Amino acid sequence: MTKKLHIKTWGCQMNEYDSSKMADLLASTHGYQLTTIPEEADLLLLNTCSIREKAQEKVFSLLGQWKLLKEKNPQLIIGVGGCVASQEGEQLRQRAPCVDVIFGPQTLHRLPEMINHVQGTNSPVVDISFPEIEKFDRLPEPRAEGPTAFVSIMEGCNKYCTFCVVPYTRGEEVSRPSDDILFEIAQLAAQGVREVNLLGQNVNAYRGATYDGDICSFAELLRLVAAIDGIDRVRFTTSHPIEFTDDIIDVYRDTPELVSFLHLPVQSGSDRILTMMKRAHTALEYKAIIRKLRQARPDIQISSDFIVGFPGETQQDFEQTMKLVADIHFDTSYSFIYSPRPGTPAADLPDNVSEEEKKQRLHILQQRISQQAMEISRKMVGTVQRVLVEGTSRKNVMELAGRTENNRVVNFEGSPDMIGKFVDVEIVNVYASSLRGILLRTEDQMDLRTHESPQSVIARTRKENEIGVGIYQP
C-alpha cells in the first residue's frame, strides 16, 4: 500500500521551496505520496518559521493535535523542521515527546536516513547542524509544477540585524556554485517553466563558485539565467540595500527578462531606528538606490518590509517612515508589529510603545500603502501588459488568469492552449484584488529573446562520474 506524507508549511518562500524538495526527496527514496489530509498520513512533517511572535506556541498547538493522531496510530512518524526546530532543538522533544525527527533548514536532505533510523530503532533523532551547502548535493532532480518555479541560490545571512533570527536558525551566507543553479534552471526550462524566482535570505550577497574556480557575482548570475531559452521572466527574493550595487542596477538596463518589480526591505524610514536595527544604511541611501533603479528602469515598482513599533520608536520616527512611504510610493508591503525574537539583541531593548499605539501605526501604514497600490493599478488601465498565463480564472472557469510583472492578477478571455505561455493584454478594468484585460497578442506574435537552449546549458553544466553517467548535483 502506498505510504502517505503530509507537510504543513509556515513562513517564507524559502520554506515553501524546502517543503517541495522534501516531498520530492521522500517520494524518490521511500515512495511517499503527498496528501492534504493529516489523518491519512504515515509521515507528518511540520516546516516551521520563527520570524513572528508566538511561533513556538503555534508549533506546539499543532503538535498537540498530531499527538492524538499518533495515539490512534503508533506507527505514525512525526517530524519538525525549519527555523523553530533549529532554535529549539532537543528542547522541542522535551515539550512534545510525540516528535520523532527534528531537523534544521540545512539538514532536510538527511530526512531519508533519519526516517530509517526511527523505523529501525524506534528511537528519536535530532540533527540541526549547519553542514554548509551539502543539502543541495543530495536532492532529487527538480520537478516543474506549472510555468513558474522557485530556485534557491544561497542560504543564510551575515547581516545580524538586531531583530532577526535568520543568522541563528539558517546559518551564515553560503552560495551554491553557479553551474549547479544553471543546471537546475535549465532542467526546469526543459519541462516548460517560463519564470524563475531566485531565492535566498540576501540574494544580492550571492558569490558562487564557477567551474573554473572563479567567482560568479549576483549580477552575472542574473544575466546567465536570463540567457536560458524559455526563461523569459526572472525574479528574486529577497535583498538587502547595502549590497544592492551598481552592477545589479545595470542588469535592469540591459536584461528585459528581469521583471520591473523589486522587493527591497527597508524596515523603517527613521535613521535612528535603522541604526538600532543595525541595518547599516540610512533612509537617504535607500532612496538613492531607488532613484538609480528608476533611472535604469523607469516603470519599476517597489515593494518593501516594514516593522512598526520597534522598541523606542517615537511618533517622529513613525512619521519619518510615512514620509519614506510617500516619497518612494511603494506598491505593496509586508508590514508587521515588532515582536521580540528570543536570542536577538533587540529582545533586550526596553519597549515603551503601547500595543494600542503599535496597532494604530500599523493600520495607518497599511492603509496608505493599499491606497498607493490601488493608484498604481488604476494607472495600468489602458496600458498593455505582458501576462504569464497560469491557468483558468478562479472567478470564471471559462476564462484564463495570469500575472503581470508587478504581480497583478489579470483575468481575460482566452483558449486553454495559452496556459503556460505569455500573452499581451490591454487592461480595461480594476478590481480590489485583480485586473480585467482584453487579449491583444499571443506568444507566437512576440519577439522573445533566444540565446542558449536548456539542453545546451544542461550539457555544459552536467556532472558525470568516472564511467560517463550524468550525476545531478544542484
From Swiss-Prot:
Q: Which domain of life is it from?
A: Bacteria
**Stretches assigned to the TRAM domain:** 378-441
Cite the GO molecular-function annotations of the record: 4 iron, 4 sulfur cluster binding; metal ion binding; N6-isopentenyladenosine methylthiotransferase activity
**InterPro entries hit by this protein:** Elp3/MiaA/NifB-like_rSAM, Methylthiotransferase, Methylthiotransferase_CS, Methylthiotransferase_N, Methylthiotransferase_N_sf, MiaB_methiolase, rSAM, rSAM_horseshoe
Q: Which residues form the MTTase N-terminal domain?
A: 3-120
Q: Where in the cell is it found?
A: Cytoplasm
| Disulfide cysteine pairs (residue numbers) | none
Name the positions where [4Fe-4S] cluster 2 binds.
157, 161, 164
Its EC number(s): 2.8.4.3
Q: How is the cofactor bound?
A: Binds 2 [4Fe-4S] clusters. One cluster is coordinated with 3 cysteines and an exchangeable S-adenosyl-L-methionine.
Essential cofactor(s): [4Fe-4S] cluster
Q: Which residues form the Radical SAM core domain?
A: 143-375
Similarity-based family: Belongs to the methylthiotransferase family. MiaB subfamily.
What quaternary arrangement does the UniProt entry report? Monomer.
- Job of this protein: Catalyzes the methylthiolation of N6-(dimethylallyl)adenosine (i(6)A), leading to the formation of 2-methylthio-N6-(dimethylallyl)adenosine (ms(2)i(6)A) at position 37 in tRNAs that read codons beginning with uridine.
For this entry, the protein name equals tRNA-2-methylthio-N(6)-dimethylallyladenosine synthase
The record's gene field reads miaB
